[in-house]
């Protein structure tokens, strides 16, 4: 803290510098060139409030780097503290002086806010008396050491930086200024440099080049670095006392840019520049845009298109827009994390870049001199209206150059020095004198004024301006308010200029305009004839009249010869304002109507789509309901059919197709039951026959063996029997295969029952034919056996094939019981075949016994038996 106390030493006294509080606060000052809140370290004592870039007690001291005091204010016991809790703002007010002082700071937290408030109240209570303090200025000094520590200070009045806008492009002698030469150099040598105006140069080189220009090196050579010269242009624009485009002009450009139609937007931008821009500001903006347009036209070489160039130069040209002085109609609310401020700053930067981009892309259309209508104030017209005495005075002024103008400005600068330095932190110090200097040069120099080529365009009417002056006889304003009127509302720049001419003309005609300063009342005596002239323009009263009229503090009352007031000027201004408002309202109404039409069309399309969707869904629901009802009816019918027994179903509520299927199912069930009963009976009969004939067959074999051993002739019979038995086996296999094929054929065709019965007759006839080959006698006897007789044996117990086919033909083959019926048919066919073969074998055995039995076998009683089938 010793370092802090050492830094607080001031040469004005040895009063106690007790530290009441120290800590960080946020400071914002447009006068210092800051566009946002910056955090600084503040130290509060009984006599002053100073701030540093960092905490002087903890900052490590590097070699040669000193944490100097960046600024501060002197305190006295007349100050007061005002707190705004919603934004955590802390304002220190001083009613002393002619204008008063106000300093606004911002705390990080509410706790810091109230701590600083308490400390400031204590310090102000112990501060020196305001009447005893002599020569205080109480202004936050410029932060000269923020960019470069320890660099040399420039002269108080630089030849390059800090010059008024009127002298930005031309010097007093009419020669090109530093800025104009730099612009010409960039247009000549910088168009092919990649990244020109975007790539930054060394700050020290830029400062060195400015100092060299001030020291005599006033020309730019081809071997200089274009990036350094480009940064010199930015440096000069940044150090201008006021923005090249004021706040009201930025607002006009912003409103014109928001128009959707391109042609209307260009026309509105042209009108905004012609109507709201003062002539020096318009010429400066047009010159800089011309250089930027030249660079962007070579974008294929330098890679700087209009958008890129606008991004680099927009913050320098539209400073009020980025500083938040223009209404962007955004809804960003301040928050604790400053996110809303960041969003608002980004929105402002985007709008500024977009406006400059449009001005570059349509440069030829917007800055067409034939289309620009501006208020022209020329010294030639003033000389013509003033008479020969004014001409002599103007000639005297031209001979002396701007010496008289400087002399007239100098008292204002000296007189208002303290007030200029004691302005609010949100205003630029030193701006008032420079603006007045701009005005003097603007009025006296014919080279800076271009007469409009359109003779029908609007011109300044001295009568209208005088009326406006006369109707405001009592105007109490300070230098700060006057600076705001000229700097922030350039729409009145031409009005004030015309008022200056009117004031001078009235002074020359002998009219007494006693212009008050700082709240004095105004006396307006009767006006003499305009033909009476007064040549003394160099008197102090004349100087004060000019200055007061320019700043808006002077006023007069124009009275006609009959004593009445002329209100035509006020009515004309009111009509213009109403016309402007009407046009704006029409544009807004048209915009809203277009938006409503789009929304209405979108709503109709959505309504139609929803209606179509509704109809489609209704159709789907109806179709599905019908399908569901049909499925339910079918299910009920099937359940009824399954639950009923055969032959007992009711036809009520059942369609013909379902009824036919149910009848078919009932018949199939009856057939299956009957066939099952038949199979059971056949199995029972077969078992009985096997048991009955098994013993007879064994006796027959013994008899044949006996005959073979005793009778040689029986060997032949035995051989014939064996061949017959083999033939029977072969025939059995063949019949089995035929039955299988017949069953398959019946399943596929559902017919052919008669063919099967007929096909068996040749097979039955082949049996006697095969026996004829062995013995002619046996053949003769066996040939007498009729096939019908063989087939008639045991006919009551054996169903014919045709009967079986008739039974199996009844049910449909595609019914689920068709497979069971086919199996039963095959089984029945096999049983018939076995019975027939058994009958044939029994007949053959009987014939053999009769023919070859002899006397020894007469007593033998043959008992037929079934052969042992393998």
UniProtKB/Swiss-Prot annotation:
Gene3D superfamilies referenced in this protein's UniProt entry, alphabetically: Pleckstrin-homology domain (PH domain)/Phosphotyrosine-binding domain (PTB) (2.30.29.30), Rho GTPase activation protein (1.10.555.10)
Annotated site residues (Arginine finger) in this chain: 198
Gene Ontology cellular component terms for the protein in this record: chloroplast thylakoid membrane; cytoplasm; plasma membrane
InterPro entries recorded: MIP1_Leuzipper, PH-like_dom_sf, PH_domain, Rho_GAP_Regulators, Rho_GTPase_activation_prot, RhoGAP_dom
Superkingdom of the source species: Eukaryota
Compositional bias of kind Basic and acidic residues: 777-787
Coiled coil: 569-693
Pfam families xref list: Lzipper-MIP1, PH, RhoGAP
Biased composition (Acidic residues): 407-417
Biological role stated in the UniProt entry: Acts as a GTPase activator for the Rac-type GTPase by converting it to an inactive GDP-bound state.
This protein's name: Rho GTPase-activating protein 7
Gene: ROPGAP7
């Amino acid at each position: 803290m010793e370092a802090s106390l050492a830094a607080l030493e001031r040469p004005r006294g040895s009063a106690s510098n007790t530290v009441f509080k120290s800590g960080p606060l946020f400071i914002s000052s447009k006068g210092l060139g800051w566009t946002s809140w910056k955090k600084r370290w503040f130290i509060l004592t009984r006599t002053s409030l100073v701030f540093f870039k960092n905490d002087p007690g903890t900052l490590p001291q590097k070699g040669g780097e000193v944490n100097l005091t960046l600024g501060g204010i002197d305190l006295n016991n007349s100050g007061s503290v005002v707190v705004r809790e919603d934004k955590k703002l802390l304002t220190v007010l001083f009613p002393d002086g002619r204008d008063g002082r106000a300093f606004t700071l911002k705390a990080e937290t509410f706790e810091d806010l109230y701590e600083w408030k308490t400390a400031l109240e204590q310090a102000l209570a112990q501060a020196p008396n305001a009447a005893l303090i002599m020569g205080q200025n109480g202004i936050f000094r410029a932060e000269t050491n923020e960019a470069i520590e320890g660099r040399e200070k420039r002269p108080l009045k630089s030849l390059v930086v800090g010059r008024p806008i009127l002298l930005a492009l031309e010097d007093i002698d009419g020669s090109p200024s530093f800025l104009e030469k730099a612009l010409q150099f960039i247009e000549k040598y910088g168009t092919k440099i990649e990244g020109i105006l975007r790539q930054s140069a060394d700050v020290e080189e830029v400062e060195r080049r400015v100092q060299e220009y001030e020291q005599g090196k006033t020309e730019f050579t081809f071997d200089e670095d274009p990036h350094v010269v480009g940064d010199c242009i930015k440096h000069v624009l940044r150090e201008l006392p006021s923005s090249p485009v004021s706040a009201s002009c930025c607002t006009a450009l912003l409103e014109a840019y928001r128009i959707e139609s391109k042609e209307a937007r260009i026309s509105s931008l042209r009108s905004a520049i012609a109507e709201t821009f003062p002539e020096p500001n318009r010429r400066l903006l047009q010159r800089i845009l011309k250089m930027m347009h030249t660079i962007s036209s070579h974008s294929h070489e330098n890679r700087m298109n209009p958008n890129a160039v606008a991004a680099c130069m927009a913050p320098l040209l539209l400073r009020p827009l980025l500083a938040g002085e223009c209404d962007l109609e955004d809804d960003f609310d301040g928050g604790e994390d400053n996110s809303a401020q960041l969003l608002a700053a980004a929105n402002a930067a985007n709008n500024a870049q977009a406006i400059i981009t449009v001005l570059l892309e349509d440069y030829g259309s917007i800055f067409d001199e034939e289309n620009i209508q501006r208020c022209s104030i020329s010294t030639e017209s003033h000389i013509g209206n003033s008479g020969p005495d004014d001409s002599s005075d103007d000639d005297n002024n031209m001979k002396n150059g701007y010496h008289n103008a400087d002399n007239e400005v100098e008292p204002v600068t000296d007189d208002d020095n303290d007030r200029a330095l004691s302005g609010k932190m949100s205003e630029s110090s030193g701006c008032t004198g420079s603006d007045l200097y701009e005005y003097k040069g603007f009025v006296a120099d014919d080279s800076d004024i271009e007469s409009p080529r359109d003779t029908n365009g609007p011109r300044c009417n001295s009568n209208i301006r005088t009326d406006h002056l006369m109707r405001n006889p009592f105007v109490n304003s300070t230098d700060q308010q006057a600076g705001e009127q000229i700097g922030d509302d350039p729409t009145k720049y031409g009005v004030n200029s015309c008022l200056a001419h009117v004031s001078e003309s009235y002074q020359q005609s002998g009219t007494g305009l006693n212009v008050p300063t700082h709240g004095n009342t105004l006396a307006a005596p009767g006006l003499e004839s305009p033909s009476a002239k007064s040549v003394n323009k160099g008197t102090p009263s004349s100087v004060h009249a000019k200055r007061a009229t320019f700043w808006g503090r002077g006023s007069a009352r124009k009275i006609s010869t009959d004593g009445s007031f002329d209100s035509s000027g006020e009515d004309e201004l009111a009509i213009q304002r109403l016309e402007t408002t009407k046009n704006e309202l029409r544009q807004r109404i048209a915009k809203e109507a277009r938006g409503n039409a789009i929304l209405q069309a979108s709503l109709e399309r959505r309504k139609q789509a929803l209606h179509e969707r509704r109809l489609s869904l209704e159709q789907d629901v109806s179709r599905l309901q019908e399908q569901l009802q049909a499925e339910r009816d079918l299910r009920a019918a099937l359940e009824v059919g399954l639950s009923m027994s055969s032959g007992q179903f009711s036809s009520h509520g059942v369609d013909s197709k379902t009824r036919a299927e149910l009848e078919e199912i009932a018949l199939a069930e009856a057939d299956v039951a009957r066939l099952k009963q038949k199979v059971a009976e056949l199995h029972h009969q077969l078992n009985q026959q096997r048991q009955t004939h098994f013993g007879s067959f064994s006796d027959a074999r013994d008899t044949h063996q006996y005959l073979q051993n005793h009778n040689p002739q029986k060997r032949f019979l035995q051989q014939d029997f064996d061949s017959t038995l083999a033939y029977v086996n072969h025939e059995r296999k063949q019949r089995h295969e035929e039955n299988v094929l017949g069953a398959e054929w019946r399943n596929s065709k559902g017919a052919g029952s008669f063919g099967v019965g007929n096909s068996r007759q040749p097979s039955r006839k082949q049996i006697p034919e095969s026996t004829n080959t062995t013995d002619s006698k046996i053949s003769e006897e066996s040939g007498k056996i009729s096939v019908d007789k063989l087939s008639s044996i045991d006919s009551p117990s054996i169903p014919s094939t045709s009967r079986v086919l008739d039974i199996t033909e009844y049910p449909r083959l595609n019914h689920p019981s068709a497979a069971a019926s086919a199996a039963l048919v095959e089984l029945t066919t096999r049983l018939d075949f076995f019975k027939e073969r058994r009958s044939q074998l029994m007949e053959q055995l009987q014939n053999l016994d009769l023919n070859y039995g002899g006397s020894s076998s007469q007593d033998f009683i043959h008992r037929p038996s079934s052969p042992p089938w393998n």
